[in-house]
């Protein structure tokens, strides 16, 4: 979809760059890239293309949205970010949380995802139940990412590769463990591990395994496992689209 990005002031652009520097330092110091990426994704992934509600508009800071089961643990991210936000009040929460996701990927060795400022904060959080369920298969992934958010099959597989960062926590999701050997390094190892089968100590969710059994998803898994550069290019595009759902639509 064509975008018509708002023009922001020089002062606002300066605030964005200051926030970027502060985020780099925080994420490097606290090794919290996976948590910040999850915050950005869960903030944006509530967008519903038919009703034009939800999306990356700063509502994750509300107790109502933080209480959604899929967001368990994200209150930690919100609390970690608040001192920077208080220091840089000019930037919207909407931009700030998406910028945190962009910086998380960059600091971890991933691609430089473009960032366009100008999202405005919205007061009302989306209803619960719009984020993907890790226990379900490819039909569910297409319903949530495709029909609800308006993303493509390629976007679904590329974004799944973001699980190269982080781990599941039993108390948050019911699952336990990392997807890869180095959960703080953004690379294509999610795909290589997925293709190599179950391994002790590494996690493969039902939604991960669904990528292998689907005739459209599996060739993309194989492509990204063989070609990290191709994965980075497609991930960059998919992350950008996710971070701008409902924002600056022409």
Curated annotation (Swiss-Prot):
GO molecular function, one term: heme binding
Annotated site location: Transition state stabilizer: 38
GO biological process: cellular response to oxidative stress; hydrogen peroxide catabolic process; response to reactive oxygen species
Organism encoding this protein: Oryza sativa subsp. indica
Induction pattern: By salt stress and hydrogen peroxide.
Keyword Iron found: yes
Note: Binds one cation per subunit; probably K(+), but might also be Ca(2+).
Region listing for Disordered, in residue ranges: 113-137
UniProt record similarity statement: Belongs to the peroxidase family. Ascorbate peroxidase subfamily.
Cross-referenced CDD domains: ascorbate_peroxidase
Binding site for heme b: 163
Residues annotated as binding K(+): 164, 180, 182, 187
Cofactor(s) needed by this chain: heme b
Active site: 42
EC id: 1.11.1.11
Function according to Swiss-Prot or TrEMBL: Plays a key role in hydrogen peroxide removal.
Family annotation (SUPFAM superfamilies): Heme-dependent peroxidases
Cofactor, how bound (note): Binds 1 heme b (iron(II)-protoporphyrin IX) group.
PANTHER family per the UniProt record, alphabetical: L-ASCORBATE PEROXIDASE 1, CYTOSOLIC, THYLAKOID LUMENAL 29 KDA PROTEIN, CHLOROPLASTIC-RELATED
Protein name, UniProt field: L-ascorbate peroxidase 1, cytosolic
Keyword terms, alphabetized: Calcium, Cytoplasm, Heme, Hydrogen peroxide, Iron, Metal-binding, Oxidoreductase, Peroxidase, Potassium, Stress response
